[in-house]
């Protein structure tokens, strides 16, 4: 069933209340035409889902992650990164920090990238002493065929907004010392290298810990 047909079917027999409380049939022609004009905002995936993008990047869109997106995200994680996590880990991050778990999708609504973060409270990376509410960028990835479009930066910027909304005063991440492209992007976003974790990754490679104030 096409999106427009599904919207029409869902509207039949339903009412809304205006003020004063006067019921108006949703299938009233005026109301129907207004709702139909909103159809481009909807996407049919076995059901009608309102698809509101936080940002558009060319033919791509950045939006919050949905539970049904997780299988695609896990596949991207395995395809694009050497660091992998359990299914339950992804589920926990989405449940705990939905504002900072975002996806990028193309014009066919195929997910091609994501960013996953967590909100923490602990010692500050930006101050010599003291505690801070921090946003931790756990994992960010874009499929190789879609890189070079600014999607990684867009995902980062939108996730940082989510961290600010959650009251974080700073953010941090770990990155392989050999990942020049990612390091350059983070520096362009005003991240600073705080320290080096030697042998941080399972294969023995070192990691830079990078941080910035929000």
Regions found by a protein language model. Give the residues of each.
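Conserved N-terminal entry element of GNAT/NAT acetyltransferase domains
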Residues: 2-68
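Conserved hydrophobic/aromatic "anchor" residues
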Residues: 90, 114, 185, 191, ...
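C-terminal "cap" of GNAT-fold acetyltransferases
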Residues: 169-172, 176-180, 189-190, 199-214
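Short beta-strand "wing" residues that participate in macromolecule-binding interfaces
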Residues: 117, 193-194
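Acetyl-CoA-dependent GNAT
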Residues: 55-56, 60, 67-145, 156-166, ...
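Conserved glycine-rich acetyl-CoA-binding loop
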Residues: 139-157, 164-166, 170, 176-184, ...
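Residues at secondary-structure transition points
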Residues: 128-132, 150, 177, 201
């Amino acid at each position: 069933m096409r999106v427009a047909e599904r919207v029409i079917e869902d509207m039949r027999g339903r009412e809304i209340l205006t003020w004063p409380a006067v019921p108006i049939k949703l299938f009233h022609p005026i109301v129907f035409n207004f709702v139909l004009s909103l159809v481009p905002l909807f996407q049919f995936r076995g059901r009608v889902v309102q698809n509101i993008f936080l940002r558009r990047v060319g033919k791509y869109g950045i939006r919050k992650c949905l539970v049904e997106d997780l299988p695609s995200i896990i596949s991207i994680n395995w395809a694009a990164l050497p660091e992998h996590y359990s299914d339950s880990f992804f589920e926990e991050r989405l449940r705990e920090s939905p504002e900072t778990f975002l996806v990028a999708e193309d014009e066919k609504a195929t997910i091609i990238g994501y960013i996953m973060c967590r909100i923490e409270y602990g010692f500050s990376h930006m101050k010599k002493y003291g505690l801070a509410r921090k946003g931790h960028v756990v994992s960010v990835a874009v499929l190789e065929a879609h890189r070079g479009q600014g999607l990684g930066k867009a995902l980062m910027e939108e996730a940082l907004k989510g961290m600010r909304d959650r009251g974080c005063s700073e953010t941090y991440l770990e990155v392989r010392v050999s990942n020049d492209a990612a390091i350059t992007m983070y520096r362009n976003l005003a991240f600073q290298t705080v320290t080096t974790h030697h042998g941080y990754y399972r294969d023995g490679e070192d990691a830079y810990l990078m941080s910035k104030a929000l």
